[in-house]
Amino acid sequence: MDRKLKVGVLGATGMVGQRVLSLLENHPWYEVVVVAASPNSAGKRYEDAVGGRWKMTTPMPKAYKDLIVMNVNDVDAVAKEVDFVFSAVDMTKDEIKAIEEAYAKTETPVVSNNSAHRWTKDVPMVVPEINPEHFAIIESQKKRLGTKRGFIAVKPNCSIQSYAPVLNAWKEFEPEEVVVTTYQAISGAGKTFKDWPEMEGNIIPFIGGEEEKSEKEPLRIWGHIEGDEIVPATSPKITCQCVRVPVLNGHTAAVFVRFKNKPSKEELIKKLVEYKGEPQELNLPSAPKQFIQYLTEDNRPQVSLDVDFENGMGVSVGRLREDTIYDYKFIGLSHNTLRGAAGGALLCAEYLTAKNFIQAK
């Protein structure tokens, strides 16, 4: 790489946009040159546009404070300045679909944190350690969009990161039925306790749309490319309940699994700790050295002890044991705004850069 790639962050003032910017500070491959947000923020210094709404636990990086926020709707103006963009915009689904396609059509690759395009037939939805081969569908997408280098790639929902990688590590034993309950942090809703005081000491047994995503998205990730589309897998059957809990960061999952070929507990643990994907082989800057860790203590994984494993990019598993109804049960934990959101998108971008899908304009 002759120079760092120039990056724009769309939706830069929101919580996920802030997290993306924090991760891009001092990145070896990328340099943020554009922060874009709603017309209300456009024209202001980034620090002024965010005001008192900086939600990260680390200070706002100095390099971004004086950047003048561009209007996210000025697609051509933003596209002229950047090699690619991260999308974390807060709009309706149809608006997100339209604006991400508009950027792609200016020959600007879009790596999206949003759900709008997750079921667009030729848009890859990727966890780089699980299904990087789905990025091959980008060639079909470019034909549809009429582009040479512009495309959209997305990362999946934050809720599935605590169990989909685990089940993927056990694929050869053919999981057939999976029952999941997720316990999801408030940052998944873009909130802190300051914004959402009624969550303190409270549990809300419903998160809109989350259960459907948690049941269906893993099947698309385990699907295959057929012609110009990604065809989802048909198994395992997954049923899920999603609960909002009074935790700032970290989604926990309690999971029950039935296998076609029941393995031993030792075999399952071995598969977890030995699991490596292409990001590890390629030594991508944001890739965890160890993707999944297995903890033997009865009281692990815990959010307060384990959520930052591998800088929030690893998955922690514990309490694997045989079950009285299913074959096995376990607890999984992942960082919802790192592995589950901004970090997952950044890892996708790094993989796409390493494989020359994203290049300097």
Language-model regions, residue ranges each:
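N-terminal Rossmann-like NAD(P) cofactor-binding subdomain of oxidoreductases
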Residues: 1-205, 237, 309, 316, ...
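Charged docking surfaces used in two-component/phosphorelay signaling
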Residues: 187-361
